[in-house]
Curated annotation (Swiss-Prot):
A GO molecular-function descriptor: hydroxyethylthiazole kinase activity
GO biological process, one term: thiamine biosynthetic process
Domain of life: Bacteria
Keywords in alphabetical order: ATP-binding, Kinase, Magnesium, Metal-binding, Nucleotide-binding, Plasmid, Thiamine biosynthesis, Transferase
Binding site for ATP: 112, 158
Stated name of the protein: Hydroxyethylthiazole kinase
Species of provenance: Rhizobium etli (strain ATCC 51251 / DSM 11541 / JCM 21823 / NBRC 15573 / CFN 42)
Protein encoded by which gene: thiM
Pfam families: HK (PF02110)
Length: 258
């Protein structure tokens, strides 16, 4: 799937936060996709109809941004394009909770979050603090299954060991590095990469989500080998993504049934 994406680079419409825009665009470029950071409500809906996939991250919200997100999500859904929701710290404020509730009503095809975000989104009590998860992934697995069934969507919980489910099937993905949480917006970038894989294989959104997470996990392992800390890890991670190919990914991905 990685090789197929590079052979025909998808245009991924990323509505993401200010912190993440640069690294998310570079992650997509290194992986072989084409990023577009378009969030103005005056054009977001039109652009979503052009793009191969849409990703929506609520990290830096405003009323205008929400208008753009909703316009894009409606257009993507109407055009049958996959779209990914990243409900960053949605539990933190009333404004965020309402924004996410409205976006969920527009039926995202994939939802990606940390454990605290997914637990809260499914109706449970999480221990999240701001954008940081205080809950381990394994405690969010049942919540992810319930959320996937309720939303009829793929749900990915990312952390030390990732978890992906469609409500029936479920897998865990091992790999990555302890340095990954020390580089801001890598998780936001992963949401964009999920969109790229979903655009490449819209007929297999479960497999596309797993492939994106496995790509991040293997690249994270490679980047950590020579990294002295988060600074050198960040650029090594981009290099690792660019160097990874489908054969190496298939050989090294650690995916198991859950």
């Amino acid at each position: 799937m990685l090789d197929a994406m590079r052979e025909k680079p998808p245009l991924v419409h990323c509505i993401t936060n200010y912190v993440a825009m640069n690294i998310a665009a570079n992650v997509l470029l290194a992986s072989g996709a084409s990023p577009a950071m378009v969030h103005a409500p005056e054009e977001a809906g039109e652009f979503a109809g052009i793009a191969s996939a849409l990703t929506v991250n609520i990290g830096t919200l405003s009323t205008q941004w929400i208008d753009g997100m909703q316009a894009a999500a409606k257009a993507a859904a109407s055009a049958g394009k996959p779209w990914v929701l990243d409900p960053v710290a949605h539990y933190a404020t009333t404004f965020r909770r309402q924004a996410v509730a409205d976006l969920l009503a527009l039926k995202p095809t994939i939802i990606r979050g940390n454990a605290s975000e997914i637990i809260a989104l499914a109706g449970g009590e999480s221990r999240g603090q701001g954008v940081d998860s205080r809950d381990p992934v394994e405690q969010a697995e049942d919540s992810a299954r319930r959320l996937a069934e309720r939303q009829q969507a793929i749900v990915a919980v990312t952390g030390a060991v990732d978890f992906v489910t469609d409500g029936e099937r479920a897998v865990r993905i091992k790999g990555g590095s302890v340095l990954m949480p020390e580089v801001t917006a890598l998780g936001c970038s992963l949401t964009c990469l999920i969109g790229a894989f979903a655009a490449t294989a819209p007929e297999d959104l479960f497999g596309a989500t797993v492939a994106a997470l496995a790509t991040f996990a293997v690249a994270g392992e490679d980047a950590a080998l020579g990294a002295a800390g988060p600074g050198s890890f960040a650029w090594r991670f981009l290099d690792a993504l660019a160097a990874l190919d489908g054969e190496a990914l298939d050989a090294r991905a650690r995916v198991s049934l859950a």
